């Protein structure tokens, strides 16, 4: 069975594949994960006001177009003293999307006078699975058949015009996962991305502490953890783990 991951980021596809197929025991032989980017599907505009809404929006867009089950996630950082900001704006908190250094610098400036015991935060992820109703068939613009993956372009008059299928939705599932922790005052670590260098998770790997100069023996940031250590406690891993029963149900 093919499942489309609603992303154009191949790194995220690899991470989700690893979590689902290895860490969580989903049968790799029966599931082929493909990215929306590899199918040349456009990114939908994220108009939701919650992580759940945006995850569902992205998964729906893919399932409707392809006729295949779709998985999507939306995640970000919630800082308690900032009224749960940056939230859904985490990736573009400083203006430009994905500018990690600028986002981190702005966050540190905004909570610079907050004492350490009040710098609590959490990463939150919403993971969604949307299953299309393929038995009902698809509405097809242009009046010719479409298989959901191949976009047919043969029009009745012999010209070429893009044709897109639109499948109805059969079911939707969305799950949440949190990784609680706190924001430190300067970046540490070379792994991860986003706010990872500023975030110290509450759950720490046994026997491992920071070796950074002036911070020896302190708890690790997300960016100091290995991928396996981070996946074991991550918000995305927790949300996807909660989604596994719904994915496994598709195989039976």
From Swiss-Prot:
Species whose genome carries this gene: Bifidobacterium longum subsp. infantis (strain ATCC 15697 / DSM 20088 / JCM 1222 / NCTC 11817 / S12)
Protein name: dITP/XTP pyrophosphatase
Single Gene Ontology BP annotation: purine nucleoside triphosphate catabolic process
Binding site for Mg(2+): 74
Active site: residue positions: 74
PANTHER family in alphabetical order: INOSINE TRIPHOSPHATE PYROPHOSPHATASE, INOSINE TRIPHOSPHATE PYROPHOSPHATASE/HAM1 PROTEIN
InterPro entries membership: dITP/XTP_pyrophosphatase (IPR020922), ITPase-like_fam (IPR029001), RdgB/HAM1 (IPR002637)
Cofactor: Mg(2+)
Reaction equation(s) it catalyzes: XTP + H2O = XMP + diphosphate + H(+); dITP + H2O = dIMP + diphosphate + H(+); ITP + H2O = IMP + diphosphate + H(+)
